[in-house]
């Protein structure tokens, strides 16, 4: 059976693993998912990620990040633009998540960017998700 929204599936797996304090979560891999994991790592929401080449497909293993008192680095992850309703933002109207405490992940002509990076470059795009 095919998956309707692979990104929502990835975010749900991360949220569920994060909720029960798992150290790692495994999702089917794609270039977009690897790019999102890379962006989350650069922003400090996850520890690391790796791609495992298994047959029939590749797997993306994401190491979740917690504080010394088991506090979550990634408190929330929400899918914004969905297959049934795409959400786009102009460069002049980019979203701000929790007053700048979170990030919006945008798919732009310059690749995947956070809302602050897109503001600096002056580009808009599809708002894929919010992370805080």
Swiss-Prot record:
UniProt-listed HAMAP family: Ribosomal_uS8_B
Family of this protein: Belongs to the universal ribosomal protein uS8 family.
Biological function: One of the primary rRNA binding proteins, it binds directly to 16S rRNA central domain where it helps coordinate assembly of the platform of the 30S subunit.
Protein name per the record: Small ribosomal subunit protein uS8
GO MF, any single term: structural constituent of ribosome
Listed Pfam families: Ribosomal_S8
Gene3D superfamilies assigned: 3.30.1370.30, 3.30.1490.10
Source organism (scientific name): Tropheryma whipplei (strain Twist) (Whipple's bacillus)
PROSITE patterns for this protein: RIBOSOMAL_S8
Gene, per the UniProt record: rpsH
GO terms under cellular component: ribonucleoprotein complex; ribosome
Keyword Ribonucleoprotein: yes
Alphabetical keyword list: Ribonucleoprotein, Ribosomal protein, RNA-binding, rRNA-binding
Keyword Zinc-finger: no
Oligomeric and partner information: Part of the 30S ribosomal subunit. Contacts proteins S5 and S12.
Disulphide-bonded residues: none
GO biological process: translation
Family matches, as InterPro entries: Ribosomal_uS8, Ribosomal_uS8_CS, Ribosomal_uS8_sf
């Amino acid at each position: 059976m095919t998956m309707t929204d692979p990104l929502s599936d990835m975010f749900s797996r991360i949220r569920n693993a994060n909720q029960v304090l798992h150290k790692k979560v495994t999702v089917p891999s794609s270039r977009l998912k690897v790019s999102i994991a890379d962006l989350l790592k650069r922003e400090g929401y996850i520890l690391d990620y790796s791609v495992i080449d298994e047959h029939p497909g590749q797997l993306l293993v994401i190491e979740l990040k917690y504080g010394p008192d088991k506090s979550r680095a990634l408190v929330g992850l929400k899918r914004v633009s969905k297959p049934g309703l795409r959400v786009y933002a102009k460069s002049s109207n980019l979203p701000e998540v929790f007053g700048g405490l979170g990030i919006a992940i945008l798919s732009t002509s310059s690749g995947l960017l956070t809302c602050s990076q897109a503001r600096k470059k002056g580009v808009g795009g599809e708002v894929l998700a919010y992370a805080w």
